[in-house]
């Protein structure tokens, strides 16, 4: 495990996070219309409830704070966060086949945990992440190269999700 891997893990866990609301819609036209409404004073929360196709829509677009280093969130979203100010509405952001609108709802959350205090933990987490990545690579490779007969439904579902194969 490299020092940079440990530092990256530290950034993911303890790095700057941004409290946000999001709206996810299926088209640029709708995203543009919604952005205009929001910039005209419409409530982000009410608009998210009305239009968002994301599961957060029911909560007015409220999601857990987004860490700018967390790869769970697409880089297109993470890259915008440091450039927005509180209550500012982002321009529509394309993520896969959907459009996302973001509003920063509060000041960035900055951890006061020193790296040195958690370095052993970062080593362990980094090692686990690397092992998981390598196991997923191996699993995908084996699935592609070999025909398997699997009798356990849980294993079938897990492997199907790895291979993106609906069979």
Question: Over which residues does each language-model region extend?
Answer:
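Acidic/polar surface patches and capping/hinge elements
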Residues: 1-19, 49-50
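Soluble non-cytosolic domains of exported or imported proteins
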Residues: 1-4, 17, 24-29, 38-42, ...
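Cell-wall glycan
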Residues: 11-14, 21, 67-86, 167
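Extracytoplasmic
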Residues: 15-20, 29-31, 58-60, 88, ...
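Solvent-exposed, amphipathic alpha-helical segments
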Residues: 30-37, 80-83
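Gram-negative outer-membrane assembly/targeting C-terminal domains
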Residues: 153-167
């Amino acid at each position: 495990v490299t020092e940079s891997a440990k530092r990256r893990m530290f950034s993911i866990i303890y790095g700057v996070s941004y409290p946000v609301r999001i709206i996810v819609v299926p088209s640029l036209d709708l995203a543009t219309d919604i952005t205009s409404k929001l910039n005209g004073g419409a409530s982000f929360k009410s608009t998210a409830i009305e239009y968002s196709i994301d599961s957060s829509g029911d909560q007015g677009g409220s999601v857990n704070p987004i860490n700018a280093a967390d790869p769970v969130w697409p880089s297109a979203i993470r890259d915008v966060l440091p450039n927005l100010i509180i209550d500012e509405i982002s321009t529509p952001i394309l993520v896969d086949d959907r459009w996302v609108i973001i509003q920063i709802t509060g000041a960035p959350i900055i951890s006061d945990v020193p790296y040195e205090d958690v370095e052993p933990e970062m080593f362990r987490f980094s090692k686990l992440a690397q092992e998981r990545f390598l196991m997923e690579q191996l699993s995908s490779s084996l699935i592609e190269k070999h025909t398997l007969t699997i009798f356990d439904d849980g294993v079938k579902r897990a492997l199907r999700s790895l291979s993106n194969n609906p069979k």
